[in-house]
């Protein structure tokens, strides 16, 4: 089973039959339209390419326009690809959120919020040094970052200050709380990466 591309709407909460509050993320999944079907003979692997949403005509490049016309679908806001195994799809086919009706858990992939250049305390959860006791300048610095003349260098991968966020993140095995096919919504328990209105990829959980 392939995944779908959706849009993170935001978080809210719902109550179950016992009155327990469940924090959920609302993901809007409009129809994913098939723009290309890749085969073993032509492409060396099997996959399906989809688009969703819409894009201003003035923003669609000529190569993109030709690609969408060939598939017979409206230009979408992007192109995404999912590997397939024995599943059959046709150009222009629409895949909707109801494919998750019988799915218990999903993996959600998105781009985390960018936080710019951050220090070790925020980026890696380092503890801070003493506020007093003679420490006047090094409250939030890392401390030692190496050894001595041997090895005479800082090891690769050393946790230091640097760019935080704005990277591809996958949260695994989120429980599917509700599938609302009429309103094109999927509610999953917990948080998912990314800002409001950002694109997310939802797939059946690998570890379910």
From Swiss-Prot:
Taxonomic lineage: Bacteria, Pseudomonadati, Pseudomonadota, Gammaproteobacteria, Pasteurellales
Gene Ontology MF term list: rRNA binding; structural constituent of ribosome
Keyword Transport (UniProt): no
PANTHER family tied to this protein: 50S RIBOSOMAL PROTEIN L3, LARGE RIBOSOMAL SUBUNIT PROTEIN UL3C
PTM characteristics: Methylated by PrmB.
Residue positions where N5-methylglutamine is found in the record: 149
GO BP, one annotated term: translation
Parts forming coiled coils: none
Protein name as catalogued: Large ribosomal subunit protein uL3
Functional description taken from the UniProt entry: One of the primary rRNA binding proteins, it binds directly near the 3'-end of the 23S rRNA, where it nucleates assembly of the 50S subunit.
NCBIfam families (alphabetical): L3_bact
Family in the record: Belongs to the universal ribosomal protein uL3 family.
InterPro entries with a match to the protein in the record: Ribosomal_uL3, Ribosomal_uL3_bac/org-type, Ribosomal_uL3_CS, Transl_B-barrel_sf
């Amino acid at each position: 089973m392939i995944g779908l591309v959706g849009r993170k709407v935001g978080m809210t909460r719902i109550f179950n039959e016992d009155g327990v509050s469940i924090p959920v993320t609302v993901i809007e999944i409009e129809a994913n339209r098939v723009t290309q079907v890749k085969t073993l003979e032509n492409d060396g692997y099997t996959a399906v390419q989809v688009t969703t949403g819409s894009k201003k005509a003035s923003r669609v490049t000529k190569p993109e326009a030709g690609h969408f016309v060939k598939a017979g679908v409206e230009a979408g806001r992007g192109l995404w690809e999912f590997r397939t195994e024995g599943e059959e799809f046709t150009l222009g086919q629409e895949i909707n959120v109801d494919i998750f009706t019988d799915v218990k858990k999903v993996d959600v992939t998105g781009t985390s919020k960018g936080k710019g250049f951050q220090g070790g305390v925020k980026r890696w959860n380092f503890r801070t040094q003493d506020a007093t006791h003679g420490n006047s300048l090094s409250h939030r610095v890392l401390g030692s970052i190496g050894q001595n003349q041997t090895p005479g260098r800082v090891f690769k991968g050393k946790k230091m200050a640097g760019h935080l966020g704005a990277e591809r993140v996958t949260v695994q095995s989120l429980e599917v709380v509700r599938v609302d096919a009429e309103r094109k919504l999927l509610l999953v328990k917990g948080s998912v990466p990314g800002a409001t209105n950002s694109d997310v990829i939802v797939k059946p959980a690998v570890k379910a």
